[in-house]
């Protein structure tokens, strides 16, 4: 492999391609003369669009093919949305860099209404996220929640075709695709706690590839890493996946981190919440500690019941 070349495995969706192009541009800016190639590929998650994620295997659906490409030395790195990255990595691969986070909030998108509170009784809302469904149902049990799969453009088209009165998307994706004008309102973290890692881009590579790791190092954003580490640690301890409504969101003020988390029933009938504060350098420990608090408050019974049905 040429010392001056790097190959990026990426999904083919417009948002995934934006993320890969972003990393490509950053590498070219930092390392003049470097040759960066994009290797777009389809993942199982991109192909299976008629079934809710919770029923077809969850987060790993969006990364496995990219990881195989790296293990087979067809690619050097893979670029991911952090909220799609599973807890565990295949042997020989690891998460080398987490880039600076975009807006982590959820976005309310509608052509008719400005916010969830404005929706009329019995309105139809589209989202495939059990985390979002749970929190919406808790505040608005009258709403009809329908699954919504596909890339951002497909989801917006379904809204525009009248299949939904509103849809909920990650704000970061709309911002990156220059579709901010479609956002009717941002949903605060207090109203809808984001998914762990939402809005952050991660770069995975072979853990023994020192050449690539050195090239990637300048893209690391330490504050984002602390936040995402805490959120993922909570999720890991809870053994969370796509089939359980789990929210986690860390904020940093100086050296102090505040991490909020929740576990809920998919129908929104019960939500268990917690918050913890401590040094940002203890990010992983804070995540585990908050998970333990949630479990002690009754999250375990919710998780056991959900997994029993899965």
UniProtKB/Swiss-Prot annotation:
GO terms for molecular function: hydroxymethylbilane synthase activity. It catalyses: 4 porphobilinogen + H2O = hydroxymethylbilane + 4 NH4(+). GO terms for biological process: protoporphyrinogen IX biosynthetic process. Pathway: Porphyrin-containing compound metabolism; protoporphyrin-IX biosynthesis; coproporphyrinogen-III from 5-aminolevulinate: step 2/4. Keywords: Porphyrin biosynthesis, Transferase. Binds 1 dipyrromethane group covalently. One of its GO terms (cellular component) is cytoplasm. InterPro entries: HemC (IPR000860), Porphobilin_deaminase_cofac_BS (IPR022419), Porphobilin_deaminase_N (IPR022417), Porphobilinogen_deaminase_C (IPR022418), Porphobilinogen_deaminase_C_sf (IPR036803). Transmembrane segments: none annotated. The keyword Transferase applies. The modification S-(dipyrrolylmethanemethyl)cysteine is found at residue 242. Its cofactor is dipyrromethane. Monomer. The porphobilinogen subunits are added to the dipyrromethane group. Tetrapolymerization of the monopyrrole PBG into the hydroxymethylbilane pre-uroporphyrinogen in several discrete steps. This is Porphobilinogen deaminase. The lineage of its organism: Bacteria, Pseudomonadati, Pseudomonadota, Gammaproteobacteria, Alteromonadales. The gene is hemC.
């Amino acid at each position: 492999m040429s010392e001056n070349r790097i190959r990026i495995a990426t999904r083919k969706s417009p948002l995934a391609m934006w993320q890969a192009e972003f990393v490509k541009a950053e590498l070219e800016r930092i390392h003049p003369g470097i040759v960066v190639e994009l290797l777009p590929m389809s993942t199982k998650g991109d192909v299976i669009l008629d079934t809710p994620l919770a029923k077809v295997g969850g987060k790993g659906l969006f990364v496995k093919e990219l990881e195989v490409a790296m293990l087979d030395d067809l690619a050097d790195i893979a670029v991911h949305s952090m909220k799609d990255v599973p807890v565990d990595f295949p042997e020989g691969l690891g998460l080398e860099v987490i880039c600076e986070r975009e807006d982590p909030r959820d976005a309310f998108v509608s052509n008719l209404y400005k916010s969830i509170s404005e929706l009329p009784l019995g309105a139809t809302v589209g989202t495939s996220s059990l985390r979002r469904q749970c929190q919406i149902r808790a505040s608005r049990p009258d709403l009809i929640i329908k699954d919504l799969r596909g890339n951002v453009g497909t989801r917006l088209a379904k809204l525009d075709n009248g299949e939904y009165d509103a849809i909920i998307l990650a704000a970061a994706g709309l911002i990156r695709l220059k579709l901010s004008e479609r956002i009717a309102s941002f949903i605060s973290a207090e109203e809808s706690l984001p998914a762990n890692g939402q809005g952050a881009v991660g770069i995975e590579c072979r853990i023994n590839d020192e050449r690539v790791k050195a090239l990637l190092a300048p893209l690391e954003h330490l504050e984002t890493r602390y936040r995402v580490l805490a959120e993922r640690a909570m999720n890991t301890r809870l053994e969370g996946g796509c089939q359980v409504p789990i929210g986690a969101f860390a904020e940093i003020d100086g050296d102090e981190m505040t991490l909020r988390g929740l576990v809920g029933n998919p129908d929104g009938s019960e939500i268990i919440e917690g918050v913890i504060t401590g040094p940002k350098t203890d990010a992983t420990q804070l995540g585990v500690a908050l998970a333990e608090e949630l479990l002690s408050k009754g999250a375990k019974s919710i998780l056991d019941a959900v997994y029993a049905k899965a």
